[in-house]
Amino acid sequence: MLDITFYKKQNNDNFVPCIIELCDEDYEKIIVSNFAKRFHSEKQCLIVEEEEYSIDAVYCDALVLEEAKEICNRLLFEELEKVQNYCSKIEGETINKSKLNFMFVLRDVLSSLGECQYFSYV
């Protein structure tokens, strides 16, 4: 199960969460792309998370977004050592192959977002 939480910003700077739950059979690019287009048009906040592992994308610039895509691609091509070294600096733990389904979805989301201004592992 993958939860994608989209936070809509209100006038008083509060955020209201809208959660989309994706089962394994829903890991299709068109579903993720449709969600990403909605996020992109709102230009607010995207949080993608699975269990304790989460990634925030809030106002990313193109350079950092490209780096995020590269991390996903490295996982998908099983260049795990480079990814583990990078991610251990950020979250103090390595990423294993059980996260690959998550990364497939994440890659499609990132590919559909276009430019944003901020990206970070949490």
Annotated model-derived regions:
Residues 1-122:
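Acidic (Asp/Glu-rich) sequence patches and key acidic residues
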